């Protein structure tokens, strides 16, 4: 299903670990590849442009990303297909892929477009939905969940040690409808030393809300359970994560799956040059595994 109401020109995502990921899939073999988190299409563009014997199916839950990628990849329209779907719900049928790639987390355009409600630095409705057709919003969680559930959410998904203080302040001051209102309330709930630390005091709470709104960790686990069966023998899966919760799930899933052999004993990290040109790449980690060949 394709979106027709998005504005592709507003969706420009800087791809992280682009060549490391694509080359890690061994694209010289050609064949079909699955881009499970299409985003702005950067990884797929590199694959399609440098390996003409490849074809791509691109998935994304965000219709704005699909629209942007259709524009970016129009030179390869005979070799790429698009589906508006969460990768956890994808059904490949009988197709088997030589490679599967996923670049997880929120994209730069989603952060930068204030109206999406992902950023605590820009005023916007408390939304945070990657798929605008989904029902649950960040406002619903903040305004309707009880204090204990909020604290547990912020602790588990945000790894925030001050989760109880923050949840108490949210309940005391709600309802909240705007991102900056919530951000300021969180900042007021924490000690002054914490308020002016290395990261903004709302960072982890906003991460927790985003993960919950979009069901990110459940979707990732479902995808990791299913994706190895979508690979041809010897095919590879490459996954980029941006925080420890994702990376922990990926590491244990790849190591514990007898359908796969782990290629990267330790995750591949961005170079200093990439971090300097794109500071958001700093926390990225790339892990790669290969589908085990059937026993003869």
UniProtKB/Swiss-Prot annotation:
CDD domains to which the protein is assigned, alphabetical: AdoMet_MTases
Which cysteine pairs are covalently linked by disulfides here?
none
User: What Gene Ontology terms for biological process does this UniProt record contain?
Assistant: rRNA base methylation
Q: Which domain of life is it from?
A: Bacteria
Keyword check for Transferase, yes or no.
Answer: yes
What cellular component GO annotations does this protein have?
A: cytoplasm
Function, in words: Specifically methylates the N4 position of cytidine in position 1402 (C1402) of 16S rRNA.
Enumerate the GO terms in the molecular function aspect.
Answer: rRNA (cytosine-N4-)-methyltransferase activity
Q: What HAMAP family is this protein classified in?
A: 16SrRNA_methyltr_H
Location of the protein in the cell = Cytoplasm
- Extract the InterPro entries matched here: RsmH, SAM-dep_MeTrfase_MraW_recog, SAM-dependent_MTases_sf
Q: Which reaction does it catalyse?
A: cytidine(1402) in 16S rRNA + S-adenosyl-L-methionine = N(4)-methylcytidine(1402) in 16S rRNA + S-adenosyl-L-homocysteine + H(+)
Q: What does the UniProt keyword field contain?
A: Cytoplasm, Methyltransferase, rRNA processing, S-adenosyl-L-methionine, Transferase
Q: Which Enzyme Commission numbers does its entry carry?
A: 2.1.1.199
| Family (UniProt) | Belongs to the methyltransferase superfamily. RsmH family.
* Main subcellular location: cytoplasm
Q: What is this protein called?
A: Ribosomal RNA small subunit methyltransferase H
Q: What enzyme category does the UniProt record give?
A: transferase
Residue sites binding S-adenosyl-L-methionine per the record: 41-43, 60, 87, 103, 110
């Amino acid at each position: 299903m394709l979106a027709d109401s998005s504005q592709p020109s507003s969706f420009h995502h800087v791809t992280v670990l682009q060549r490391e990921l694509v080359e890690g899939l061994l694209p010289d073999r050609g064949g079909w590849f699955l881009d499970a988190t299409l985003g702005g299409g950067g990884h797929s563009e590199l694959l399609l442009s440098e390996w003409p014997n490849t074809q791509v199916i691109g998935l994304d839950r965000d219709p704005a990303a699909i629209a942007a990628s259709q524009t970016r990849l129009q030179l390869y329209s005979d070799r790429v297909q698009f589906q508006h779907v969460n990768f956890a719900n994808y059904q490949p049928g009988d197709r088997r892929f030589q490679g599967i790639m996923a670049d997880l987390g929120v994209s730069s355009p989603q952060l930068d477009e204030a109206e999406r409600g992902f950023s605590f630095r820009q005023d916007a409705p408390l939304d945070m939905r990657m798929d605008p057709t989904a029902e649950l919003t960040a406002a619903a969680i903040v305004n309707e969940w009880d204090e204990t559930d909020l604290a547990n959410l912020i602790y588990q998904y945000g790894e925030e040690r001050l989760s109880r203080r923050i949840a108490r302040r949210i309940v005391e001051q709600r309802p909240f409808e705007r991102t900056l209102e919530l951000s300021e309330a969180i900042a007021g709930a924490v000690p002054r030393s914490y308020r002016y630390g290395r990261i903004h005091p709302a960072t982890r709470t906003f991460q927790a809300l985003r993960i919950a709104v979009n069901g990110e960790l459940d979707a990732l686990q479902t995808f990791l359970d299913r994706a190895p069966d979508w690979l041809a023998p010897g095919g590879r899966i490459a996954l980029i994560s941006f925080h420890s919760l994702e990376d922990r799930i990926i590491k244990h899933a790849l190591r514990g799956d007898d359908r796969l052999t782990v290629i990267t004993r330790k995750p591949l990290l961005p170079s200093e040059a990439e971090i300097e040109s794109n500071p958001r790449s700093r926390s990225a980690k790339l892990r790669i595994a290969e589908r085990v060949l059937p026993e003869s």
